[in-house]
Structures are given as structure tokens and as C-alpha cells.
């Protein structure tokens, strides 16, 4: 056996680790992960916002939310989130979850109906981290 400490992890290794974990999880919960994203582009085709995640375990796991600075506050983020939530509900999801940092958008997610279900705070030099959940009529 050889154990290595890596300072960088390439995409292939990261994906292999994720695949092995999902295979293990699948042996306990017979459900697979389905990618889901909603994106917005401007008239020139430039990406101006997006929400990306996956549906699994009857939940929408939101992994990335980004809106270009000049489009923040325009309602674009809310529209992208709503589109993903609608599709997640069609897929049988009962809730959505995400995590965010204190300098990112916890207030935005609260406006979307998410509630803080856990947090990590008080670590010097580190932003607070919030774990948030939104239940869909269940």
C-alpha cells in the first residue's frame, strides 16, 4: 500500500473518487444522480448567470449559483432558481439544499424560501458558512 499527500487534484482523480463514493451510496439507496442546470446568456451569447446542481435522494442539491455583477438584483437569479426548482419537483424532489458563505448570498436564498439548517462560524480569518434547505410542499 502507498499513501500520497497531493497538493493538487486533477479532474480525473476527483471524478474517480466521486464515482466510487456514488457507487457505494447507490448500494444503500438505489437512486442515481441526474445533473440539472439553468443558464442565461446575453444577446451576444455570453454567460450572464446560472444555477447548477443535481437531483438525487429526492432532493435538489444546488452546487453553483452565479449571476454576473451587472445583472444582480434584476430578478435573474430568482428566475434561474425557480426554473431548477420546477424541474426538480417534476423529478420527484421534495426539497432543495445548498451551502453558502457569509459574503455570498445568504439573504438572497432566504428570499427564495431557504432556511438555515446549520452553520459553521467563529473561525478566525474564515467566513461563516451556512447550510440551507427549502422544502417543496411536503
What residue spans do the PLM features occupy?
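Conserved acetyl-CoA-binding loop-helix of GNAT-fold acetyltransferases
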Residues: 73-86, 111
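A short, well-structured alpha-helix characteristic of acyl/acetyltransferase catalytic modules
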Residues: 10-20
